[in-house]
Every structure is written in structure tokens, then in C-alpha cells.
Amino acid sequence: MSHQPKPLSEVEHIKTQSRLLRGSLAESLEDPVTGGLATPDTNLIKFHGSYQQDDRDVREERRQQKLEPDYSFMLRTRLPGGVCTPAQWLVMDALAREHANHTLRITTRQAFQLHGVIKDDLRPTIARINEAMMDTLAACGDVNRNVLCNPNPVDSRVHETVYQWAVRISEHLLPKTRAYYEVWLGKEKVAGGEDEPIYGATYLPRKFKAAVAVPPLNDVDVFAQDLGFIAIIEGDALVGFNVSVGGGMGATHGDAATYPRLADVVGFIPPEQTLAVAEEVVKIHRDFGDRTNRKHARLKYVLEERGVPWFTAELEKRLGFPLQPARPFAFEHNGDRFGWTEGHDGRWHLTLHLDSGRVADRPGAPHLTGLREIARIHTGDFRLTANQNLVIAGVTPEARDAIGALVTAHALDSFRSASPVRRNALACVALPTCGLAMAEAERYLPTFVGRLEDRLRAHGLQDANLLLRITGCPNGCARPYLAEVGLVGKAPGRYNLHLGGDARGQRLSHLYRENIDEDAILAALEPLFEGYARERQPGEGFGDFVVRAGHVPSPAVQPRPS
């Protein structure tokens, strides 16, 4: 009996016919009849760094009025390692006020997002981003996304070297099509000879995420990435990277064939082999990823189903050289270090806490204005963290008092007073703009944290470094499956409760309760907090406790898909 191959997903056909990501984007942008794009172009624009969205708070009202959805666009920058200059910050600040919803958002991939950009403003907004020596190319889509890197230059000069490798990886894996420059920047079409040497005409089966980590901090959650480079430092020198492959957070409710997965460390390489390894890992995803089912298309499923030994052998065959054995390393924490720290060169770095990465002017908290004023006098740079916070980096000793005064005057000093659970918490955007959200996340986080703080305080745990993450759907943009307490949206006001991750980003959590509301979540946590307060060992985190006490399975017995 012959087996017919499964049909390709619809997006694969769109990419095939797109002429290297051009599609009919130019025509869609000029169409005055609608605030949206032609359906195929809504997929293609992701590669250019944007998502078409609509305001779900008014979707039903507009439907009843026989109006099209209230379309707008989210724009995301490509900003390797999250480093930007004060001048670039001021450009993003101006665009947020002129063309977006008067807010900036720092993402869990160290990038800026603008929300609420209307179709007619897309071209001028993208043009100004490019004029500021940034871009949005490959910030979304079936390509390598923004490359993460430890954002804080405190520890050593090696951190700057590692950051430069993150930039080189990002540039090396950038799509080569001229479509972006033609559609958005008015560049002339070049006749013939265009190809995609790494991606091919249909790019990857799904998104690809890469990160560079510098132990002992795992602030980029390297094991949640498709590809990770873990810096190995001996003395004051970078000697190479351990390579990790096959991580990913996304899953689908009710589909056992989809699941979060931690990456596997497959070996060690010297720095000069970094770009070759990055390219060949991407090509393996290109050639073996599932193009028939986008929910099953990430690289992690290739490793899970074919096995790590197969993957390593395939990678070494393509490279033409073997990987060396992985070298020892240790992670201590995956959070940020708040407040002032002095760097190796005598300059100072101030890490600010931002709720869910949102920079806005709110009553009593004019953060957007405050950071604008800081950018006008700052001579160092800004570093966006993968925990949605911000480092004002490279502050001279002479400027420290002035920067500190602006921070205080604009209520940017919450890192001093916020509880550890509030400082460490992450949330995705979710409603009202994300089309995938099943429940609230960013808008709900402050309320839930407040109630959680009350329960922790009742048990004397107000200083516990609890790691909480909330996402509005199971795709896991805020990496909830690595949290000690993770809420994953299931329906309006209802979440799956995951417990048992750790504060090092090295252990997946376990589903503890399914489809429950806030009261039930707090009721489920109450006896665990009581036990943790009574029985925890010195230095033991909450996630470690719930595993040790048997409330959730340990990783050794946690079921894995077969």
C-alpha cells in the first residue's frame, strides 16, 4: 500500500508563491478600502517584523455594527542582545507617541514592540526605525528571530566579546531577500540573481530562536531556545561555547503531540566555529522540520522524535568536523540584578524594573517621560533584558546622581520597594491585541500579584524570590513552563496552573491544576505556601520544594511523549 504524503500547511503555499516574501504586500498597503491586509500578506508581513491585530475588546461590537475589525499592527524591532543608544531610544519614544498607542513594550526577546500602528503609518514608522540604524526584518516569521544575550556589561570585558558574537549570529542568519527594502524603504528592484542560501525559497517550517548565555546568569533562559551558545570563560578569556539545541515553550491545549521541551547540550566549540554551527542547525530545521502541521513544526520535535544522537551525527556530518565534549558550567539564577552595580571600567549600570516591560505615562508613574529625559542626558547605552526590564548602562560616576534623580522623580525606582515576586514576574501582552490569547496576562498580572503577595505575607514569605509567569495561551511567550508558578490561559478568567520550575531555567514545570479561576489557583497554592514556610531547607526555592516534597513529579519521573 502506498502512503500519500501529508499536504503542506497553507502557510507553506503562501511562502512558495511569495517571491521571497514580497507577495502582494505593496498592493495591500495601498488599498484604501480596508485597514487590514490581504489574507496571504498577513502571514508574510510577519517576516518583515509586524503582526496584523485588532482590538478584541470591541470586536463583537464592531461585528454587530457590520464594521470590519479595528485593525492595527504590532511592530517589533530586531535588536541583538537588546542594546540600543540613547538616540535610538528617543526615536522609539517618538514613534510610540506619534504612530502607536503612546507606549513602548520591552519583550522577552530584548526587543521593542510598538502597538496600535495603523496601516498608513507602517511605512513611515519602519523607515524611521531604519534611519536610526535599527530594523524590523526577521523580528517575526519562520526565520531566526532576535538573538538574545546577557545584557549587563558588569562582570568583565568578555561580556562585550560575547555580545559581539550575538550580533554576528543575528547578521549571519538574516534573510537575504531584498523584499524588505523594496516594500518599506523604496529601494529599487534588482533584476535576477536573488536567492536565500541558508533558508531557501520557503524559509523555515516555523520560528527559530537563539540565545547566548554567560554563566552563572541564565537571564536569557538558554534552554528554552532552539539554539543556545553557553559561554565558557577561562581566566579572562572566552574559550568557546557549549552548544544547546532543541528547546521551545510552545504547546497546544489538548494536543499531546505538542509540548514544551528543554534544550540538550550536544557539545563544545571554539568561537571560530560559531557561525558554521548556527547555520547548519538552522539548515537541519529547514530540511527535517514538519511543514505539514505548524503546531508540530519547531526544531524540538525533530530532536525529540529522531533523537539527540541522530541530531548530533547529522550536525557533525554537515559541519565536516566533530563537536568537542561539553565543558562544565553552572547557572545560579535566570533573573535580573536590580539597582546600581559598578562595571569593570568604573562606569555604573542601573537595572530598572518595568511591569511586563511596558513603558507608559500613567498617573503617578510617568515612565515614558522619565526615560525620555534620561535618554537626553545619558552618554552610555540602554540594554533591554529578556526579563522585560531595562539597564541604563555605562553611566559615568559624574552622571550617576543626575540619572538617579530622574529615576526617582519619574517613579522608575520600583526596584527598591517592589516585592521579589513582583520584580521577577513576567507576562505576555495577551488581550486585547493578541489574536491567540484565551485569557488575560499583562493586564491581569498586577491584580494577581497583589493577591499572591497577600498570601505569601500571611505565611512570612514576603521576601521569597518566587518566580511567577503568566501567558494568555499555551504558546508560552513569557516562558511560563520554566516558572516556579506558571499560569497558562485556558479561557477567560481561567488558567492551567503549572508548578515546579526553578530559578535557574533548568527544569520544566508540571501541570498541577487544569482550567481553574483565580480563587481556585490561590486555594491550590495555600497549603503549598504553608508547607514551604514550615519545611523549606536553607536556600531552597519554592519550585525545588514542591518537587522535593512530591507535590509534582521530579524530572526523572515526569512523563515525556513517546
Curated annotation (Swiss-Prot):
Reaction equations catalysed: hydrogen sulfide + 3 NADP(+) + 3 H2O = sulfite + 3 NADPH + 4 H(+)
Cofactor stoichiometry and binding remark: Binds 1 siroheme per subunit. Binds 1 [4Fe-4S] cluster per subunit.
Cofactor: siroheme; [4Fe-4S] cluster
Gene Ontology cellular component annotations, sorted alphabetically: sulfite reductase complex (NADPH)
Record protein name field: Sulfite reductase [NADPH] hemoprotein beta-component
Function: Component of the sulfite reductase complex that catalyzes the 6-electron reduction of sulfite to sulfide. This is one of several activities required for the biosynthesis of L-cysteine from sulfate.
UniProt-listed GO biological process terms: cysteine biosynthetic process; hydrogen sulfide biosynthetic process; sulfate assimilation
Subunit annotation: Alpha(8)-beta(8). The alpha component is a flavoprotein, the beta component is a hemoprotein.
HAMAP family reported in the protein's UniProt record: CysI
Binding-site list for [4Fe-4S] cluster: C428, C434, C473, C477
UniProt: siroheme binding residues: C477
Residue ranges crossing the lipid bilayer per the database entry: none
Keywords in alphabetical order: 4Fe-4S, Amino-acid biosynthesis, Cysteine biosynthesis, Heme, Iron, Iron-sulfur, Metal-binding, NADP, Oxidoreductase
EC number of this enzyme: 1.8.1.2
Protein family according to the UniProt entry: Belongs to the nitrite and sulfite reductase 4Fe-4S domain family.
One Gene Ontology term of the molecular function aspect: 4 iron, 4 sulfur cluster binding
RNA-binding in keyword set: no
Lineage: Bacteria, Pseudomonadati, Myxococcota, Myxococcia, Myxococcales
Pathway: Sulfur metabolism; hydrogen sulfide biosynthesis; hydrogen sulfide from sulfite (NADPH route): step 1/1
